[in-house]
């Protein structure tokens, strides 16, 4: 699914576990990755064979990475608790809307 964040187009796609491990140079094959975010190519990859509830939580997590990469250019900034709360409050509606659209789109294609 394609979506925009701060006028940048991103893609969410579901992939096999070996693709996630390859992206992390981890060939242990123990099913350790549920998702990852690639800011350089503006893609979020989700492990396709996890339960919907886990996939949803993973997508929220990865979208927070996306939000941080897109809106907050930082490098090793130490956030205060108030900074974290502001980031969470400001990103909440954006991220929840994308997750809702993603799973509504997924449900349309179920047989």
Annotate each language-model stretch with its function.
Residues 57-69:
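Active-site recognition of the HExxH zinc-binding catalytic motif
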Residues 1-54, 70-111:
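Metalloprotease/metallohydrolase-associated module, dominated by Zn2+-dependent proteases
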């Amino acid at each position: 699914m394609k979506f925009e964040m701060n006028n940048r187009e991103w893609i969410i796609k579901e992939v096999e576990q070996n693709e996630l491990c390859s992206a992390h140079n981890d060939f242990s094959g123990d099913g350790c990755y549920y998702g990852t975010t690639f800011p350089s190519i503006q893609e979020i990859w989700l492990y396709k064979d996890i339960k919907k509830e886990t996939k949803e939580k993973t997508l929220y997590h990865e979208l927070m990475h996306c939000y941080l990469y897109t809106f907050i250019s930082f490098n090793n900034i130490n956030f205060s608790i108030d900074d974290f709360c502001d980031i969470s409050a400001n990103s909440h509606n954006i991220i929840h809307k994308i997750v809702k659209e993603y799973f509504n789109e997924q449900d349309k294609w179920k047989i």
